From Swiss-Prot:
InterPro entries: Arrestin (IPR000698), Arrestin-like_C (IPR014752), Arrestin-like_N (IPR011021), Arrestin_C-like (IPR011022), Arrestin_CS (IPR017864), Arrestin_N (IPR014753), Ig_E-set (IPR014756). The lineage of its organism: Eukaryota, Metazoa, Ecdysozoa, Arthropoda, Hexapoda. It comes from Drosophila melanogaster. Pfam families: Arrestin_C, Arrestin_N. Changing residue 52 to D: In photoreceptors, leads to an equivalent distribution of per in the nuclei in both day and night ultimately resulting in a decrease in Bdbt foci development. Signal peptide: none annotated. This is Phosrestin-1. The modification Phosphoserine is found at residue 366. Belongs to the arrestin family. Regulates photoreceptor cell deactivation. Arr1 and Arr2 proteins are mediators of rhodopsin inactivation and are essential for the termination of the phototransduction cascade. Involved in regulating normal cycles of per nuclear accumulation in brain circadian neurons and thus is important for normal circadian behavior. In the dark, functions with Arr1 to promote the formation of cytosolic Bdbt foci, which are required for dco localization to photoreceptor nuclei where it phosphorylates and activates degradation of per. GO terms for molecular function: G protein-coupled receptor binding; opsin binding. PANTHER family: ARRESTIN, PHOSRESTIN-1. The gene is Arr2.
Amino acid sequence: MVVSVKVFKKATPNGKVTFYLGRRDFIDHIDYCDPVDGVIVVEPDYLKNRKVFGQLATTYRYGREEDEVMGVKFSKELILCREQIVPMTNPNMEMTPMQEKLVRKLGSNAYPFTFHFPPNSPSSVTLQQEGDDNGKPLGVEYTIRAFVGDSEDDRQHKRSMVSLVIKKLQYAPLNRGQRLPSSLVSKGFTFSNGKISLEVTLDREIYYHGEKTAATVQVSNNSKKSVKSIKCFIVQHTEITMVNAQFSKHVAQLETKEGCPITPGANLTKTFYLIPLAANNKDRHGIALDGHLKDEDVNLASSTMVQEGKSTGDACGIVISYSVRIKLNCGTLGGEMQTDVPFKLLQPAPGTIEKKRSNAMKKMKSIEQHRNVKGYYQDDDDNIVFEDFAKMRMNNVNMAD
């Protein structure tokens, strides 16, 4: 069985410079981050003593584009690194296996490049827009671009510039650990004796996207009140560090009266299952995603991970966390009592069974979708499959229109 390798490509509007990337997602392993490695092909005799420069940039948009009036901007763009790609400043640079294969296939006009993310750079996050909002989405976005000029400070002309949006993601550690997060709260009442105790325990600390979260709820009613119903939520907490704003959204929920009312002196133990999915929150404004909702493989934004010894308060960009929230309805006079149990929602680590299964499903979908699509072709000599970059997203946009 021959395994083909997919390579994404994108050319400048004039077709003279073409980007080739082996992947769109780059992984932050906490202590190091995957480099952005690719190849640029320039048509012969096009440069005429000019050079090709490359940049890795991030755009942090924390306000709506339509609100930018009187010169006020609600976005920041930072150039994280830049370098001259053509002519090569380091002809002896070490290439990855993918770069070696592409250079061998594309010939002498192919030039490899490598960019590195700075330490502690934020992960890619997109905040879902309202249905009628066609402006640029809020969030953190990474772009690599190349342009032709005499120096790095030359004006970038659209005809000779190419840019690609990439994602910087975090994966779960290989070992999910044995810790079972839990929370225990009690509530007393002003005009009656006794308390209601609520204990919530999760079956693990780290969940993968698409997995069920299992919350075991134990209620002990030692008061004179009754518990009328139980509500269970998965809450996504978002912190926008640039403006010090925080908000929370329910990404999964259920309400039940099974086992209720819990009368005075009674106890209840029950396990609730919820699955937080981006597909179930398509029309929810402000939900944080790890990409655009039009992408076929989009997930809810992963929990923000930091190095050991640091807290998420030290992170920059958009900080994401999750919790299971249980609410007990104790009647009109008794009010509600609630508790939150935090957990982490992440991508499965490379090498795990869950990651292999996820990759296999994505590959099957990709093959089926692109079997007869123009712009997607295979080179049998080197087992390389070329796909026009962002074509899938454009197809989805056209279908939506």
